[in-house]
Amino acid sequence: MTPTAPTLLRPTDPADVSRLLAGARAVAGGTDLLVQRRAGAEAPTLVDLTGLAGARPAVTSDDAAGELTISAVHPLTDIANGLTDGAGVFPALTAAICQFASTTIRNRATIGGNLVTGSPAADTVPALLAAGAAIDIVTPDGGLRTVDLAEFLLGPRRVDLAAGEWVTSVRVPQPPVEGGFRKIGGRRAQAISFLNLAWQWHREPDGRLTGVRLAMGSVAPTVVRLRTAAAVLEAQLPTQDVVDAAVAAIDADISPIDDLRASAHYRRRCAAGLLREALLPPSGTARADQYVTPTTREKNQ
Protein backbone atom coordinates (compact mmCIF):
# COMPACT_ATOMS: atom_id res chain seq x y z
CA MET A 1 0.00 0.00 0.00
CA THR A 2 1.32 3.46 -0.89
CA PRO A 3 2.13 5.52 2.23
CA THR A 4 -0.09 8.53 2.85
CA ALA A 5 1.62 11.79 1.92
CA PRO A 6 2.71 13.60 5.10
CA THR A 7 2.25 17.25 5.97
CA LEU A 8 5.53 19.12 5.45
CA LEU A 9 6.48 22.11 7.62
CA ARG A 10 9.59 24.18 6.85
CA PRO A 11 10.47 26.64 9.63
CA THR A 12 13.14 29.28 9.08
CA ASP A 13 13.48 30.28 12.74
CA PRO A 14 15.17 27.77 15.10
CA ALA A 15 12.86 28.94 17.89
CA ASP A 16 9.88 27.45 16.03
CA VAL A 17 11.32 23.97 15.54
CA SER A 18 10.76 22.53 19.02
CA ARG A 19 7.10 23.60 18.98
CA LEU A 20 6.51 22.11 15.54
CA LEU A 21 8.21 18.83 16.42
CA ALA A 22 5.51 17.88 18.93
CA GLY A 23 4.05 14.73 17.35
CA ALA A 24 6.16 15.21 14.21
CA ARG A 25 9.45 14.00 12.82
CA ALA A 26 12.46 16.09 11.83
CA VAL A 27 14.01 15.66 8.38
CA ALA A 28 16.76 17.51 6.57
CA GLY A 29 17.93 16.29 3.16
CA GLY A 30 15.42 13.45 3.32
CA THR A 31 17.62 11.14 1.22
CA ASP A 32 16.79 8.16 3.47
CA LEU A 33 13.15 9.13 3.98
CA LEU A 34 11.58 7.23 1.08
CA VAL A 35 13.51 4.07 1.97
CA GLN A 36 12.26 4.24 5.56
CA ARG A 37 8.67 4.99 4.52
CA ARG A 38 8.64 2.01 2.19
CA ALA A 39 9.83 -0.07 5.14
CA GLY A 40 6.78 1.07 7.10
CA ALA A 41 8.12 4.05 9.05
CA GLU A 42 5.22 6.52 8.97
CA ALA A 43 5.12 10.11 10.20
CA PRO A 44 2.00 12.22 9.53
CA THR A 45 3.96 15.46 9.85
CA LEU A 46 7.53 16.19 8.80
CA VAL A 47 9.52 19.22 9.93
CA ASP A 48 12.06 20.15 7.26
CA LEU A 49 15.14 21.63 8.95
CA THR A 50 16.84 22.82 5.78
CA GLY A 51 15.00 26.13 6.04
CA LEU A 52 17.35 26.95 8.91
CA ALA A 53 20.46 26.79 6.74
CA GLY A 54 20.18 30.38 5.54
CA ALA A 55 20.60 31.78 9.04
CA ARG A 56 24.24 30.69 9.47
CA PRO A 57 27.30 29.51 7.55
CA ALA A 58 27.89 25.83 6.85
CA VAL A 59 31.24 25.84 8.66
CA THR A 60 32.71 28.28 11.17
CA SER A 61 36.14 28.28 12.77
CA ASP A 62 36.85 29.55 16.27
CA ASP A 63 40.60 30.04 16.38
CA ALA A 64 40.55 31.04 20.04
CA ALA A 65 38.76 27.83 21.04
CA GLY A 66 40.63 25.82 18.43
CA GLU A 67 37.51 24.19 17.05
CA LEU A 68 35.27 23.96 14.01
CA THR A 69 31.49 24.15 14.14
CA ILE A 70 29.77 22.27 11.32
CA SER A 71 26.11 22.82 10.57
CA ALA A 72 23.91 19.73 10.80
CA VAL A 73 21.32 21.15 8.38
CA HIS A 74 23.42 22.33 5.42
CA PRO A 75 23.91 19.99 2.43
CA LEU A 76 27.18 18.06 2.40
CA THR A 77 28.25 19.99 -0.70
CA ASP A 78 28.10 23.22 1.30
CA ILE A 79 30.12 21.62 4.11
CA ALA A 80 32.85 20.50 1.70
CA ASN A 81 32.91 23.93 0.06
CA GLY A 82 33.16 25.61 3.46
CA LEU A 83 36.13 23.47 4.40
CA THR A 84 37.79 23.95 1.02
CA ASP A 85 37.25 27.73 1.02
CA GLY A 86 39.25 28.23 4.20
CA ALA A 87 36.62 28.17 6.95
CA GLY A 88 38.62 25.32 8.44
CA VAL A 89 40.80 22.35 7.58
CA PHE A 90 39.35 18.87 7.98
CA PRO A 91 40.89 16.61 5.33
CA ALA A 92 39.29 13.37 6.55
CA LEU A 93 35.76 14.78 6.43
CA THR A 94 36.35 16.55 3.12
CA ALA A 95 37.57 13.29 1.59
CA ALA A 96 34.60 11.39 3.04
CA ILE A 97 32.12 13.86 1.56
CA CYS A 98 33.81 13.67 -1.84
CA GLN A 99 33.25 9.89 -1.80
CA PHE A 100 29.72 10.09 -0.41
CA ALA A 101 27.03 8.64 -2.72
CA SER A 102 26.71 10.94 -5.76
CA THR A 103 26.71 14.66 -6.54
CA THR A 104 22.91 14.71 -6.51
CA ILE A 105 22.74 13.10 -3.07
CA ARG A 106 25.52 15.32 -1.67
CA ASN A 107 23.49 18.35 -2.74
CA ARG A 108 20.68 17.17 -0.43
CA ALA A 109 22.14 14.97 2.32
CA THR A 110 23.27 16.52 5.60
CA ILE A 111 25.67 15.72 8.42
CA GLY A 112 22.73 15.68 10.82
CA GLY A 113 20.87 13.10 8.78
CA ASN A 114 23.94 10.89 8.41
CA LEU A 115 24.37 10.98 12.19
CA VAL A 116 20.81 10.38 13.38
CA THR A 117 20.17 7.41 11.09
CA GLY A 118 22.69 5.58 13.27
CA SER A 119 24.06 3.45 10.44
CA PRO A 120 27.37 1.71 11.23
CA ALA A 121 28.23 2.20 7.53
CA ALA A 122 27.73 6.00 7.53
CA ASP A 123 30.55 7.64 5.58
CA THR A 124 30.87 10.96 7.43
CA VAL A 125 30.81 9.46 10.92
CA PRO A 126 34.32 7.89 11.03
CA ALA A 127 35.98 11.25 10.31
CA LEU A 128 33.88 12.95 12.99
CA LEU A 129 34.51 10.19 15.53
CA ALA A 130 38.24 10.20 14.89
CA ALA A 131 38.26 13.96 15.43
CA GLY A 132 36.51 13.70 18.82
CA ALA A 133 33.29 15.38 17.71
CA ALA A 134 30.61 16.67 20.07
CA ILE A 135 26.96 16.84 19.00
CA ASP A 136 24.85 19.91 19.86
CA ILE A 137 21.22 18.89 20.39
CA VAL A 138 18.25 21.22 20.85
CA THR A 139 15.83 19.88 23.47
CA PRO A 140 12.00 20.18 23.37
CA ASP A 141 12.08 23.17 25.73
CA GLY A 142 14.49 25.02 23.42
CA GLY A 143 17.55 24.30 25.55
CA LEU A 144 20.82 22.86 24.34
CA ARG A 145 22.64 19.74 25.42
CA THR A 146 25.94 18.43 24.13
CA VAL A 147 26.96 14.80 23.90
CA ASP A 148 30.18 13.21 22.69
CA LEU A 149 29.68 11.43 19.38
CA ALA A 150 31.01 8.19 20.88
CA GLU A 151 28.16 8.30 23.42
CA PHE A 152 25.58 9.48 20.87
CA LEU A 153 25.95 6.26 18.86
CA LEU A 154 24.09 3.52 20.75
CA GLY A 155 23.76 0.73 18.17
CA PRO A 156 22.50 -0.03 14.67
CA ARG A 157 19.89 2.65 13.87
CA ARG A 158 19.95 3.78 17.52
CA VAL A 159 21.24 7.14 18.76
CA ASP A 160 20.89 9.26 21.88
CA LEU A 161 18.13 11.51 20.55
CA ALA A 162 14.82 11.77 22.41
CA ALA A 163 11.43 12.63 20.93
CA GLY A 164 11.23 16.33 20.10
CA GLU A 165 15.03 16.78 19.98
CA TRP A 166 17.04 17.69 16.89
CA VAL A 167 20.72 18.02 16.02
CA THR A 168 21.75 21.57 15.22
CA SER A 169 25.54 21.33 14.82
CA VAL A 170 28.67 19.28 15.30
CA ARG A 171 31.80 20.68 16.94
CA VAL A 172 35.28 19.23 16.54
CA PRO A 173 38.71 20.27 17.79
CA GLN A 174 40.61 21.71 14.84
CA PRO A 175 41.96 18.57 13.13
CA PRO A 176 45.58 18.32 11.96
CA VAL A 177 46.30 18.96 8.31
CA GLU A 178 47.16 15.31 7.71
CA GLY A 179 44.21 12.98 7.56
CA GLY A 180 42.11 11.06 5.12
CA PHE A 181 39.33 8.63 4.36
CA ARG A 182 39.05 5.46 2.32
CA LYS A 183 36.09 3.22 1.64
CA ILE A 184 35.40 -0.04 -0.11
CA GLY A 185 32.08 -0.48 -1.88
CA GLY A 186 30.51 -2.39 -4.71
CA ARG A 187 31.21 0.51 -7.10
CA ARG A 188 32.75 3.97 -7.11
CA ALA A 189 29.53 5.87 -6.38
CA GLN A 190 26.01 5.32 -5.11
CA ALA A 191 27.13 2.41 -2.91
CA ILE A 192 26.88 1.72 0.80
CA SER A 193 30.32 1.03 2.25
CA PHE A 194 31.37 -2.54 2.88
CA LEU A 195 34.00 -0.90 5.07
CA ASN A 196 35.40 2.58 5.62
CA LEU A 197 38.29 4.14 7.52
CA ALA A 198 39.11 7.69 8.60
CA TRP A 199 42.37 8.79 10.15
CA GLN A 200 44.19 11.84 11.39
CA TRP A 201 47.59 12.44 12.92
CA HIS A 202 50.41 14.96 13.22
CA ARG A 203 53.66 14.10 11.48
CA GLU A 204 56.61 15.38 13.48
CA PRO A 205 59.72 16.77 11.74
CA ASP A 206 61.49 13.45 12.27
CA GLY A 207 58.56 11.57 10.68
CA ARG A 208 57.03 10.17 13.84
CA LEU A 209 53.23 10.15 14.10
CA THR A 210 51.57 11.77 17.10
CA GLY A 211 47.95 12.39 18.01
CA VAL A 212 47.00 9.28 16.04
CA ARG A 213 43.25 8.76 15.81
CA LEU A 214 41.57 6.10 13.68
CA ALA A 215 37.89 5.23 13.22
CA MET A 216 36.26 2.53 11.12
CA GLY A 217 32.72 1.82 9.94
CA SER A 218 30.84 -1.40 9.10
CA VAL A 219 32.93 -3.51 11.48
CA ALA A 220 30.84 -3.25 14.67
CA PRO A 221 27.32 -2.25 15.79
CA THR A 222 28.44 1.38 15.52
CA VAL A 223 31.35 3.19 13.93
CA VAL A 224 34.28 2.54 16.30
CA ARG A 225 37.66 4.00 17.22
CA LEU A 226 40.65 1.77 16.54
CA ARG A 227 42.26 2.65 19.84
CA THR A 228 44.59 -0.33 20.07
CA ALA A 229 46.05 0.18 16.61
CA ALA A 230 46.38 3.93 17.25
CA ALA A 231 48.29 3.25 20.46
CA VAL A 232 50.74 1.05 18.55
CA LEU A 233 51.39 3.89 16.08
CA GLU A 234 51.63 6.72 18.59
CA ALA A 235 55.05 8.44 18.61
CA GLN A 236 56.43 5.88 16.15
CA LEU A 237 57.88 6.07 12.68
CA PRO A 238 55.51 4.24 10.31
CA THR A 239 58.07 1.60 9.38
CA GLN A 240 57.00 -1.73 7.93
CA ASP A 241 57.35 -3.43 11.33
CA VAL A 242 55.30 -0.76 13.12
CA VAL A 243 52.60 -0.84 10.46
CA ASP A 244 52.45 -4.64 10.66
CA ALA A 245 51.98 -4.40 14.43
CA ALA A 246 49.23 -1.78 14.07
CA VAL A 247 47.42 -3.87 11.47
CA ALA A 248 47.61 -6.92 13.74
CA ALA A 249 46.07 -4.85 16.56
CA ILE A 250 42.91 -4.00 14.61
CA ASP A 251 41.12 -7.20 15.65
CA ALA A 252 41.04 -6.00 19.27
CA ASP A 253 38.64 -3.20 18.35
CA ILE A 254 36.33 -4.63 15.67
CA SER A 255 33.59 -7.26 15.59
CA PRO A 256 32.37 -7.53 11.99
CA ILE A 257 29.44 -9.72 10.95
CA ASP A 258 28.33 -11.51 7.82
CA ASP A 259 25.58 -9.64 5.99
CA LEU A 260 24.23 -9.10 2.48
CA ARG A 261 27.09 -6.78 1.54
CA ALA A 262 30.14 -8.67 2.79
CA SER A 263 31.36 -11.42 5.07
CA ALA A 264 33.08 -10.86 8.40
CA HIS A 265 36.21 -12.53 7.02
CA TYR A 266 36.29 -10.17 4.06
CA ARG A 267 35.82 -7.15 6.30
CA ARG A 268 38.73 -8.20 8.51
CA ARG A 269 40.95 -8.54 5.45
CA CYS A 270 39.85 -5.17 4.14
CA ALA A 271 40.33 -3.49 7.52
CA ALA A 272 43.96 -4.57 7.48
CA GLY A 273 44.41 -3.44 3.88
CA LEU A 274 42.83 -0.02 4.39
CA LEU A 275 45.01 0.83 7.38
CA ARG A 276 48.13 -0.44 5.66
CA GLU A 277 47.41 1.68 2.56
CA ALA A 278 46.71 4.76 4.69
CA LEU A 279 50.09 4.41 6.38
CA LEU A 280 52.11 3.12 3.43
CA PRO A 281 50.38 4.23 0.22
CA PRO A 282 51.32 2.05 -2.77
CA SER A 283 53.82 3.65 -5.12
CA GLY A 284 52.18 5.93 -7.65
CA THR A 285 49.02 6.60 -5.61
CA ALA A 286 47.89 9.68 -3.70
CA ARG A 287 49.53 10.44 -0.39
CA ALA A 288 47.63 9.38 2.72
CA ASP A 289 46.43 12.92 3.39
CA GLN A 290 44.81 13.25 -0.03
CA TYR A 291 41.49 12.02 -1.34
CA VAL A 292 41.43 8.41 -2.44
CA THR A 293 38.80 7.15 -4.86
CA PRO A 294 37.33 3.85 -3.64
CA THR A 295 37.94 0.72 -5.64
CA THR A 296 35.72 -2.28 -6.25
CA ARG A 297 36.77 -5.47 -4.49
CA GLU A 298 35.44 -9.02 -4.47
CA LYS A 299 33.36 -8.97 -1.29
CA ASN A 300 33.30 -12.70 -0.60
CA GLN A 301 37.00 -13.47 -0.82
Predicted regions and their residues:
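C-terminal structural segment of proteins
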Residues: 1-301
